[in-house]
From Swiss-Prot:
Intracellular or extracellular location(s): Secreted, Cell wall
All residue ranges annotated as the Barwin domain in the record: 26-147
Protein name (database record): Pathogenesis-related protein PR-4A
GO molecular function, one term: RNA nuclease activity
Disulfide links within the chain: C54-C86, C75-C109, C89-C145
Major localization listed first in the record, in broad terms: secreted
Signal peptide from the UniProt entry: 1-25
Organism (species): Nicotiana tabacum (Common tobacco)
Annotated InterPro entries: Barwin_CS, Barwin_dom, PR4, RlpA-like_sf
SUPFAM superfamilies listed in its UniProt record: Barwin-like endoglucanases
Keyword tags: Cell wall, Disulfide bond, Pathogenesis-related protein, Plant defense, Secreted, Signal
Protein's GO biological process: defense response to bacterium; defense response to fungus
UniProt GO cellular component terms: extracellular region
Induction of the gene: By TMV infection.
Length: 147
């Protein structure tokens, strides 16, 4: 009986460890974030007009869905890639100021981090350091978009 209980305890601890590892894989710290001139307000939040990677799957979503959050391209070190990341949301925090916002992934990038819409970048860059450096250092975590 004691062996069975030890086995169950080991299995439970393994499952808990796996869940914690999966949760950790959905966030990253000290990530480089640049900006892109999507300016969705000027193109009626049209993912096709922006030539966004995720347009294939998300361009026909309701306007309210496309407007709900600022846009970003995602190529961060942790989390899903490609189509699996499309439409997902990130809570992004400027590590220098603590300023946070939620963004929606609409595109891919190749800078190893995030490529935020310029409006989102400016919203996070409350002290101007990102503009001066040409990039921000941010933390991100995948969050529920509440759609």
């Amino acid at each position: 009986m004691e062996r069975v209980n030890n086995y169950k305890l080991c299995v439970a601890l393994l499952i808990i460890s796996m869940v914690m590892a999966m949760a950790a894989a959905q966030s990253a710290t000290n990530v480089r974030s640049t900006y892109h001139l999507y300016n969705p307000q000027n193109i009626n939040w049209d993912l096709r007009a922006a030539s966004a990677f995720c347009a294939t799957w998300d361009a026909d979503k309701p306007l309210a869905w496309r407007q709900k959050y600022g846009w970003t391209a995602f190529c961060g070190p942790a989390g899903p890639r490609g189509q699996d990341s499309c439409g997902r949301c990130l809570r992004v925090t400027n590590t220098g100021t603590g300023t946070q916002t939620t963004v929606r992934i609409v595109d891919q990038c190749s800078n190893g981090g995030l490529d935020l819409d310029v409006n989102v970048f400016n919203q996070l860059d409350t002290n101007g350091v990102g503009y001066q450096q040409g990039h921000l250092t941010v933390n991100y975590e995948f969050v529920n978009c509440n759609d």
